[in-house]
Amino acid sequence: MFKTEEMLALNLQLFSADVTPINVTTQDGMSPTMKTFYDTALLENAREQMIFTQFGKKQPMHGNKVEWRKFNTFAKALTPLTEGVIPSGQTFGMTKIEATTTQHGDFVAVSDRLELEAYDDVIFGATEEMGATEGETYDTLTRNILVAGNSVAYANDKASRSALTADDKLTPELVAKAATWLKKNKAPKIDGSYVAIIHPSVAFDLRNSEEWKEYHKYNDVAPIFKGEIGELHGVRFVESTASKVFKEGEVATYATLFLGKDAFGILDPEGEGMEMIVKTREQIGGPLNQFSTIGYKFCHGAKILYQERILRVETGSSYSALDEAN
């Protein structure tokens, strides 16, 4: 007689310590030298994308929340004192501004076949692209806070964004008005100038104006900021494709941000800055070591500190019919 044996189906994944590419473990499978190499590649690419963030006042923090305090200003004492009479004096106070951080991150999985058979260094390539995306993400989060500021001016004295057309371009006169607005609000300058963060489509119109051309024909302005393209009326222009584009109907409109010093703050949480995370196939690739992962993670927080030091100027451009919202 033959003995009948029952065959059991085993799920080998039950014996795997980690079967998904999402869980975070240590970096034990990678040498310190390689980890430093990839960390540097990602962070360098991330920093190249940070146009808005470079102008923020960095605030170190140890938790999830920070509080800025700014003292109220005093009125001028223009009335002469009366002999023997004590003046009423002024009240001293301060304004409190609070902000918290949010955590963001993403990753990509690279298969063992692609990693082993590709001609290029796939891990390094993915790290570079992840770094660029990390920087763009961080800077866009900062931009979204800044474009929500209270102070706005529309080109050609239009009443609202919806009234703007492609003909309502950013002009040298409008630049001068924005600079005057900052001066009247006593906004301090950034390294001797105000700064405007401008979209390439808007910069195209401004740089084609006769006043811009004449100024730069006789003035050799050395750039001091990342992305800087020139200066006009005491304003240094910094170009960014991340500058906000709105699209209502068929016309794209653009937000150019004019800034004074310390107009906004950037939170710098201790131990929660930009982090590059690489997991080898041995660490994360399941029972058959089928993939590795490359990702990033960071905490972000930003807050407008002085509404009177930031002006959003909304205009159209020669590309209003072509550009999409971002």
Regions found by a protein language model. Give the residues of each.
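N-terminal "assembly arms/tails" that initiate or stabilize quaternary assembly
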Residues: 2-100
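Sequence/fold signature of self-assembling virion shell proteins
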Residues: 16-49, 164-177, 208-326
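A generic local secondary-structure boundary/capping motif
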Residues: 56, 183-187, 225-227, 283
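Hydrophobic alpha-helical segments involved in membrane association or supramolecular assembly
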Residues: 68, 128, 192, 196, ...
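Beta-strand elements of well-folded, non-transmembrane domains
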Residues: 72, 112, 298-302
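Short, solvent-exposed loop/turn elements at domain surfaces
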Residues: 75-79, 205, 246-247
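Structured, hydrophobic secondary-structure cores that serve as assembly/anchoring elements
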Residues: 97, 102-118, 122, 179-209
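Alpha-helical scaffold segments that mediate packing/assembly in large oligomeric complexes
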Residues: 113-185, 312-314, 318-325
